[in-house]
Design a protein with these regions (language model features):
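Bacterial Sec-dependent N-terminal signal peptides
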Residues: 1-23
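Pepsin/retropepsin-fold aspartyl endopeptidases
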Residues: 18-388
């Protein structure tokens, strides 16, 4: 009996110690993106997006210049901007020193910053995850870092495969005509979406015409090119033991990049991922999901009919797109109008992510003031969903 107790105690000891993180790092949320602090060669902390879809550690070229980091120009597949391989000595995430063999690249992030409404110093993903398992907690806004195979195994256990550097899990979608379709989906924290269908999968099953009421718009990725995208909804989406009903989705028409992949059906993005505290371990190729305290399956969609972004000098908020048959088009809002105020707040009082959030409040009336043709115009928008 004494020996049995010792064995149980020893087992409990190893279980406990195996789940003690090497370090814990805080993060912030900006819109749908996880922001962590990264230092290069003992620099001041920089704002990096944590993105499981990024196979490279990438630095904004302006920041590389400010830090005095030199690089060598290289050719990247499907790249629409210049890339450099940066010479550096150390890379640290919130003072946690990363492995020495990590390559750091630089490119121009201006187009992303204009779209997201924030300064982006860099992006990191695979170079952290190939060396360490992590547990991301949206309730405490912390990421625990572990050795591979040592992270806690809590929640819905979902195996994944790797498509080059990106994790892929299986799922099933029921389209609005009640057609069920199996698929495989990238798990990407840096994709500001719910569920996106890749263009080959969408074409194969004619998804655009089976998602009910929908509209189209343009999206940007790491390249500077904009791609036509559709927004609609599906009856349900299942993955692991999770089921999400009446889900807004995106449909890509990309001809290059991961959204043109024929081997993967689409992307599970941050609007779904942030519903869960999750463990991801590239060593065991397992993902574990626990619903967090902010879990909310009532997804918000565009209800105004406008998409806003920063001007090229990042000093103004401009109307980038106006959708037909929407509150904005009916109110006479036009492309390139400058947004001056929303609900009495000037653009210096609110960030772009929060502006977009206000414009998704279905049923609310939002008052906006724009500069149109040199004159101020005030409009009241009665917000309604564009896909229901």
């Amino acid at each position: 009996m004494k020996k049995l107790i010792q064995i149980v105690a020893l087992s409990a000891f190893f279980t406990t110690t195996a789940q003690v993180p090497i370090t814990t790092i805080p993060f912030e949320l900006f819109g749908d993106h996880i922001i962590i602090k990264v230092s290069i060669d003992d620099s001041e902390p920089l704002d990096f997006i944590f993105d499981t879809g990024s196979g490279y550690t990438v630095l904004d070229d302006d920041i590389a210049g400010d830090l005095g980091l030199s690089g060598k120009k290289i050719e990247m597949n499907n790249a629409f901007s210049d890339w450099q391989l940066i010479k550096h000595n150390t890379l640290a995430i919130n003072h946690f020193l990363m492995e020495k063999n990590i390559k750091v690249y630089s490119t121009d992030f201006d187009h992303l910053e204009i779209s997201l409404g924030m300064d982006i110093d860099g992006i990191v993903g695979y170079d952290l995850l190939r060396h360490h398992a992590i547990y991301t907690n949206f309730d405490t806004k912390t990421i625990n870092i572990y050795d591979l195979g040592k992270a806690p195994k809590k929640g819905d256990a979902i195996p994944f495969t790797m498509d080059t550097t990106i994790p892929v899990i299986k799922g099933n979608v029921v389209l609005n005509n009640e057609e069920p379709h199996d698929g495989s989906f990238y798990f990407i924290t840096g994709a500001g979406t719910t569920l996106d269908f890749n263009s080959p999968y969408a074409k194969q099953w004619d998804v655009v015409h089976k998602t009910g009421k929908h509209y189209n718009y343009y999206v940007k990725g790491l390249s500077k090119e904009e791609t036509l995208h559709y927004e609609g909804h599906v009856i349900s989406f299942n993955f692991g033991n999770q089921k999400i009903e009446d889900l807004p989705i995106g449909i890509s028409t990309a001809t290059e990049g991961i959204q043109a992949s024929k081997s993967v059906s689409g992307i599970i993005g941050s609007q779904i991922i942030r519903m869960y505290n999750f463990t991801i371990d590239y060593g065991t190729k397992m993902l574990y999901l626990e619903k967090d305290h902010t879990y909310d399956a009532n997804f918000k969609v565009n209800c105004s009919g406008i998409d806003v972004q920063l001007s090229e000098d990042k000093q103004k908020v401009l109307v980038h797109q106006v959708f037909e048959n929407s509150p904005a088009s009916e109110a006479g809002i036009k492309l390139n109008d400058e947004l001056l105020k929303i609900n009495g707040m000037s653009m210096s009082e609110i960030n772009l992510a929060d502006v977009k959030k206000i414009l998704k409040q279905e049923g609310e009336t939002v008052e906006i003031v724009v500069s149109q043709g040199g004159a101020e115009k005030t409009a009241s928008l009665k917000l309604r969903s564009l896909i229901y």
